[in-house]
């Protein structure tokens, strides 16, 4: 315990910087759909603009590592945070939808690149024996900070104020990193990913990663629109999203032990059933806001655990450890690729079916995942690795794609 505290203390500036970054990102991401809806933009157009974020993110996973390798982690963080902040501020000068879509792409590119910097630093710095405790602290920082960013929406700010405040947090995030000296890890060249081959090795994990990409990033980008279309304000939307994140965070403290004892497949089924039941109750409940707050807690608990359980399932199924990195990268890529379609899919459903088209998408996703999981076998307990859902289950989980080849073995989860 003392050792993990010393590591966290020594990396205090890094944790402070990432906290400021997550607050700024939470605000700028959650505000997009709300601001566009207030300006009278249609659901499909909102989905297209939000898709820009994930297009930028996918491009970032292909090219950003070159910038980091060339400039070093501290300078790369400064570069990407500056572009991130400027892109956030530029939203305030025009309401042109194409301009906003381009800016969202820049935001996605820079945010994923910044996570790549942060997480490679953590992986290089943290000793194996205390890794889970330090990364648990990192995850706490993420959920708390991102949730605070979303809650800022409840202050009834103007669009100009939202973008200035988010940019201020993002720009401030680079300052603490200039106060530390740390050996900067190397980021190697990318290697090709063979998705069909990976599906043959870890089918349930790959399907779970695809569902998680659609579900998690669809929630972050479109949940506020779901609440607004019911006639509520951005304040209620921010509470709805924050409660769901709290449910996701608390569920992860329980699901690890459950999946270690009973298996990843039963755990995936449990989370899928919880998500599905919550979705059905959303439809039966109608628009009662208090009930939706309660349901969002369980809804978040189900969807936010999907990706971590998929990773754990893959780790259990891999018999050839030389394939662990390739499998991990394939899952992360699948998660990211699915994210591209989540805003568009949900916005189209809401255009056709109204606000609850958002829920219909989750019904289809988790019915499909449940049916597929039922065709798979549970891995015997003696073959399971210790569950550790860290550094992956977040909006930009694919930031770890570019980590060095020892990442999977050090994490003992890929």
Give, region by region, the residue ranges found by the protein language model:
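Helix-loop boundary and gating motifs at the non-cytosolic
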Residues: 4-54, 202-205, 217-230, 237
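C-terminal membrane-cytosol helix-exit motif in multi-pass small-molecule transporters
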Residues: 153-157, 167-187, 369-377
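Intrinsic disorder in cytosolic terminal tails and internal cytosolic loops
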Residues: 1-6, 185-192, 376-414
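Cytoplasmic helix-loop-helix junction between adjacent transmembrane helices
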Residues: 105-140
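Helix-to-loop junctions at the C-terminal end of transmembrane segments
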Residues: 60-72, 153-157, 251-263, 350-351
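Paired small-residue
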Residues: 98-106, 290-298
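Structural signature of the two symmetry-related core transmembrane helices
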Residues: 75-90, 167, 266-281, 363
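Intracellular juxtamembrane helix-capping segments at the cytosolic ends
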Residues: 113-126, 304-319
């Amino acid at each position: 315990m003392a050792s993990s505290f010393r590591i966290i203390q020594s990396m205090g500036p890094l944790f402070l910087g990432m906290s400021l970054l997550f607050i700024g990102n939470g605000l700028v991401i959650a505000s997009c759909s709300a601001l566009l809806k207030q300006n009278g933009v249609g659901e499909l157009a909102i989905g297209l603009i939000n898709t820009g974020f994930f297009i930028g993110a996918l491009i970032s996973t292909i090219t950003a590592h070159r910038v980091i390798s060339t400039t070093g982690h501290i300078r790369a963080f400064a570069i990407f945070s500056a572009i991130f902040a400027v892109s956030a501020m530029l939203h305030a000068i025009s309401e042109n939808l194409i301009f906003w879509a381009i800016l969202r792409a820049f935001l996605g590119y820079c945010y994923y690149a910044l996570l790549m910097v942060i997480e490679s630093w953590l992986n290089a710095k943290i000793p194996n024996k205390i890794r889970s405790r330090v990364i648990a602290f990192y995850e706490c920082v993420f959920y708390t900070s991102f949730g605070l960013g979303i809650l800022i929406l409840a202050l009834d700010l103007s669009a100009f104020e939202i973008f200035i405040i988010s940019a201020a947090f993002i720009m401030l995030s680079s300052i603490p990193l200039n106060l530390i000296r740390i050996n900067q890890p190397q980021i190697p060249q990318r290697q090709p990913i063979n998705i069909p081959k990976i599906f043959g090795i870890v089918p349930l994990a790959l399907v779970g990663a695809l569902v998680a990409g659609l579900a998690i990033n669809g929630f972050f980008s479109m949940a506020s629109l779901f609440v607004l279309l019911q006639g509520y304000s951005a304040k209620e939307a921010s509470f709805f999203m924050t409660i769901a994140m709290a449910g996701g965070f608390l569920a992860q403290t329980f699901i690890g032990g459950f999946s270690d004892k009973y298996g990843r497949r039963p755990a995936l089924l449990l989370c899928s059933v919880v998500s599905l039941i919550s979705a059905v109750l959303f439809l039966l409940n109608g628009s009662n806001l208090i009930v939706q707050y309660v349901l969002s807690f369980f809804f978040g608990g189900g969807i936010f655990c999907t990706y971590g359980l998929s990773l754990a399932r893959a780790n259990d199924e891999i018999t050839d450890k030389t394939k662990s990195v390739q499998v991990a990268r394939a899952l992360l890529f699948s998660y990211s690729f699915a994210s591209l379609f989540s805003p568009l899919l949900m916005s189209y459903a809401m255009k056709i079916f109204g606000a609850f088209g958002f829920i219909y998408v989750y019904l289809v996703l988790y019915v499909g995942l449940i049916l597929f999981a039922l065709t798979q076998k549970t891995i015997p307990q003696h073959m399971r690795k210790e569950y550790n859902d860290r550094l992956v289950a977040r909006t930009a989980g694919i930031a770890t794609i570019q980590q060095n080849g020892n990442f999977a073995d050090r994490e003992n989860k890929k």
